[in-house]
């Protein structure tokens, strides 16, 4: 009703941008007359005007004033360098991002290109801009691809990758625009706040940040905090024994009701992801282990057994993790990617290693942690892009204070979303998926099948192999993951079948008919890797091998080093055609020239990738070899385009890409992301979801209604069920899950908010010490507070002065400051409390000057080094202990809900008291350490 009265708020918002779009369009002709050098000069002029304004508010006003001109410059640069012109709707997207909102843009509408506009504008402040992506590949791709526009205009572009050293990181963070993943940014922030020297700090002050796939980062990953940890030794045999014991325990068929245990040794609650021993299970475990109490603090077992049961029941191989190089590697549930280096905490990862009979790694202790919510709230300017923001609009607004604006598509959507097909059993569903895939494939249309786990993708792969349907498999398995971009880029070819685990944030567009640009790059890599890349590097990435109907997917084991063999063996199903003799000769000459200049197998794969990517750019270059590489790339691309243009037409006529979903995800948003792969930029396309009543979502969250439906439907397993009640159950289950996980994220955020205020105080103190030129004043400040606290502890203002315990007070002062050895009670007997504090503080300052003169005689500057060392040492040690105490408090505080107390308020109050105590201990320990500091002299060492 309100919408009818006042109109759609999103439409009203979009109208506000229209006059600015017209102004940018008006400037287009004028800007197009400028030479390349003129564009660079304009950039420098704008940068000097904006960056010289130090007042934050006035600088913001300047950005608004120059926005139309800046956007017009970026549009022109993009036309010249990328041959891509920003549409009007993309200009609106850029303005929405500049205003620190979330821009919802459908798949294929050019989100990556949109980001160039606000990034360029905000980089003119000279304070740096961060573009955040979900993985290293996308960060690298965008830095190479979109970075061309910024480099062309004279701005510096940085890229942060996993294997970079601190010097490279600092250099890249100092660039005008830096591309990085969310985890690299977060971990660098934590590492910077553990640095012991200001030169080890790699990041500068945060300014403005654009997050690509913002929902993936701020919502999906918000449940898991970033943690830097150190190793703690725990007995490995306990994990192994608990794993053996878990196999002997019997799972209960149902959950306990009204406090009565079900039959069995333990119950599994999949919704809460927990395993609980029954009384019978407790007795069995105690008998097997020969102990009286599983919770005995001197010999605890309960934690190990619970983790072993969770490893057995809830952490499934090829779903939650895969085994790679004899290690259990986590698979990201949202993106389907492996996360090497990440481990589950609280001994869960060790329990999985014991279950799989792998070497058990030591447990860890948290040294530093932060949630993504609180990390990204550190940016004064935060914006994001996604294809699906409206489903999470409330959460963006409440947690991050971010508005969402839907950007209209440039062309009308022609995608058809066919109705779901629901089957009674999972077997029936997979048979139907294989059948539909085969039918659509035979029509000459490309098919993309989205699965939710590695295990399911391999099940479908074997079904399609039985049907003799050639297909590509993209999941977290290492042999498939390195072909990711190639597989997705070719997923739009006629009759192509691609099975992909969780398509969220894959980043590569599926172009109908195939991507000629990517194929050309791939062709050159196939030829050049054996000739230019070091043999030990050759497997990264190996030369792609086309999957046939019988293969299990993957790569050719070894690339031939002979050029002719590489060319003649190019699979016609991978590349659209065989290259003609003239181009083959051109490639042969290119190879000889590159080997002569770059050396025989002297490069790493990344170096070769870099050079091919540079050659694929349109930016001007003086490097003759890059020019030669560019000519060859262009020739191969044109040759492939001849075939692919015809193939694209054929695919369009057949109906475009068909997307099949094989399970409803926990979030409707991820389902929409999968659907959004079809029908990009006005293309034809269709989607359909195949579901079964045995799917996790319905089984765990559907409740009794779905269980009753299963019994009610007396149909064959391969017969689809259509029912309004079923559809409603499905939607209600999905909403239940979304609410459930939102509550978890909200709770994580609320509890971390308490830690966040403490973290800011500690990191602020640390930074002051790292940069501090006036450390002496800081330490004396600690000492003065300590003296004041000693007086408050030992002197009771309600008692007359003759009853004050002066001797104990003097003894405590001497404990801290041995240089005040001659302090006597008669010196202070007649002083008031305030005078006493002032006197002791004055004595502290005199003693500190004396200590400094002693230390400085040994080596000038040593006192300042000692101050920095002791403050950082105390902050780091006490903060680490404090984090552990806060974790323990959080676990114990939950039980107070039973006593009608709010656990969060209890956590805030007690956490605050613990924090004050930590800061007090830090100050006292620093003062004590400074006065006890006795550096070795050369004379001492000789003795």
Swiss-Prot record:
Main location: membrane
Pfam families documented for this protein: P-loop_SecA (PF21090), SecA_DEAD (PF07517), SecA_PP_bind (PF01043), SecA_SW (PF07516)
Record GO terms (molecular function): ATP binding; protein-exporting ATPase activity
Catalysed reactions, semicolon-separated: ATP + H2O + cellular proteinSide 1 = ADP + phosphate + cellular proteinSide 2
Topology with respect to the bilayer: Peripheral membrane protein
Entry annotated with the keyword Metal-binding: no
Broad enzyme group: translocase
Domain of life, source organism: Bacteria
Region feature Disordered, mapped onto this chain: 535-564
Keyword vocabulary terms for this entry: ATP-binding, Cell inner membrane, Cell membrane, Cytoplasm, Membrane, Nucleotide-binding, Protein transport, Thylakoid, Translocase, Translocation, Transport
SUPFAM superfamilies xref list: Helical scaffold and wing domains of SecA, P-loop containing nucleoside triphosphate hydrolases, Pre-protein crosslinking domain of SecA
Gene Ontology cellular-component annotations: cell envelope Sec protein transport complex; cytosol; plasma membrane-derived thylakoid membrane
Ligand binding (ATP): 90, 108-112, 509
Cited function: Part of the Sec protein translocase complex. Interacts with the SecYEG preprotein conducting channel. Has a central role in coupling the hydrolysis of ATP to the transfer of proteins into and across the cell membrane, serving as an ATP-driven molecular motor driving the stepwise translocation of polypeptide chains across the membrane. Probably participates in protein translocation into and across both the cytoplasmic and thylakoid membranes in cyanobacterial cells.
Family: Belongs to the SecA family.
Name of the protein in its database record: Protein translocase subunit SecA
Organism of origin: Prochlorococcus marinus (strain MIT 9215)
